[in-house]
Amino acid sequence: MKKLIIIFTLFLSQACNLSTMHKIDTKEDMKILYSEIAELRKKLNLNHLEIDDTLEKVAKEYAIKLGENRTITHTLFGTTPMQRIHKYDQSFNLTREILASGIELNRVVNAWLNSPSHKEALINTDTDKIGGYRLKTTDNIDIFVVLFGKRKYKN
């Protein structure tokens, strides 16, 4: 009986630990990230970026694949950002992609600004759309994928 009580207590404590873990609200997190990027671009007198459903969908798919493969690369399975976007929408003719891993939401924009190629993507003047996704892996690591794009014609 004592063993059963100990096992039950252990199980209950683990269940309590699970319930105190906070799920990531990706939509809310992306609102925060989009807001930070918009604020940065506004301070620099750059054009406003419109949130694009296709770019968000592609970013989400890619973040999940990066998480499953435990890697960060712009060319997983030999695909480019443009190829991934064209799977859903052929009208895009320009894209940029920035990735981050292991950085908290409140530090990711500054981390990108400290990298010349990421900064160039953040403050680009040749795109007008944005879409991104934040993934929390089972190892509790954040993966961010943000795509910038421009269509050659209205979709």
Swiss-Prot record:
The SCP domain, residue ranges: 37-140
Domain of life: Bacteria
PROSITE patterns in the record: PROKAR_LIPOPROTEIN
InterPro entries: CAP_dom, CAP_sf
Name of the featured protein: Uncharacterized protein BB_0689
Organism, scientific name: Borreliella burgdorferi (strain ATCC 35210 / DSM 4680 / CIP 102532 / B31)
